[in-house]
Amino acid sequence: MQIIVPHLKSKACHGARGRDRDQQDGQGCFSDRREKAARALVAWASTHPAPASTAGTLITGDLNSYARETPLTIFRNAGFSSLVHHFHPCTDAGCPQTTYRYKGRNGTLDYALASDSLMPLVLGAWSWAINAEEPPALGYRQNASPASPWRSSDHNPVIVDFAL
């Protein structure tokens, strides 16, 4: 499989100018930059030469975009599916699997997106709840003791199980 690991621009507004400023559409700052990056990734993935034996493409990383934001719409329209949401769908009550917490609210900014051709090989996917739920006081930005559990990121990792 072809694996692409992007980290799209943060929603934080430091240094945002022009179209990178918060457009008040719920996507935060730098949404234009994330949209352009998503379009470039889709274009690159569709033209990047891969051996005929390649099963498909996995785009996995911190996309700094919630599921209904423009970058995820671009990936969906290009035939990529969020694996965690495929196996653990959201309901009106919320999403059972999340990767980030901001001001006490859970959400997903990190994804494993599979191309249609890769989907038959995916056995499962989930968010490993080891970071976002932990208080920042137990985090990597403090002097955490390596002898005890500590928050190593502000995001939870996404795990995917494949039948290869």
Where are these regions (language model features)?
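Beta-strand-turn-beta hairpins that frame and shape the catalytic cleft
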Residues: M1-Q24, L164
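Beta-strand elements within well-structured catalytic alpha/beta cores of enzymes
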Residues: I3, L58-I59
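Active-site metal-binding loops of divalent metal-dependent hydrolases
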Residues: L8, D62-L63
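A general, composition-driven signal for non-globular sequence regions
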Residues: Q24-G28, A144-S145
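Short, surface-exposed loop/turn motifs that are enriched in glycine and acidic residues
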Residues: Q27-S31, S65
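Phosphate/oxyanion-binding active-site loops and adjacent basic polyanion-contact surfaces
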Residues: F30-A38
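Metal-dependent phosphoester-hydrolase catalytic domains
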Residues: E35, A45-L58, N64-L164
